[in-house]
């Protein structure tokens, strides 16, 4: 395995004290709300990493900290209700690691409870914070900036299939900042002199989406990061194999499950980083003085078995830059 590349850019200064007790006004252990729109089966790795980040700052669940877990069970419509429950319980901090949806829902309900997010979206563009250097009052976290990731994903696909002229982008209607994602993907394709076709799928339209991809004779496909698509991972990978579509995905869970390639943030780091910031806030630092930080690590994974199954030869240059190659 080639060492993963670390690229963190903290965009601000030191934080000052902000005693939790002054806000919580309640006895006992500090309480952290953990909010994700998926289910434990899909986000359990992020939850474990979140606990690890907290432990690195001295907080251990059950010993000197209580964590209230709220899972949307892959129903994004439940997220505002779950956020409202955490706000009603007056938890000390709300964490939404690895998702923007939970952070946005919590922000709409409270301006006093600190909120920590980690997301692949630009937090300024989607309205989570007003500035990376000086985040909004009670909201801060980590971001990996999907615009850069999408451009890189397309570049990797192009290097794998250099003859490709027409690329596809598989999205859902409910992705946060959908219009921006589509525009960025099309701009990245145009910069390479390629075409980008967008295929939008609903929960019951995954099969139809791949039929559409095949009918459009697309040479390769980018699968966007999205809760619905993550929940349908097995189905999507089966269809990609059936149609022999070269595809790149947003995190290594896809490659581990049989996806051809993945490029994106390390999921566990999204949880760990959120845990680190929550721990710092519990120790007294102010959210708005903790700068939004760039995600520290990304990884590029190639599944050679899948590549061979669809009859593609991986250029040595791609193998050389891969962080991991699954044989």
Locate each region found by the language model.
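Short hydrophobic alpha-helices and adjacent helix-cap/hinge residues
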Residues: 1-327
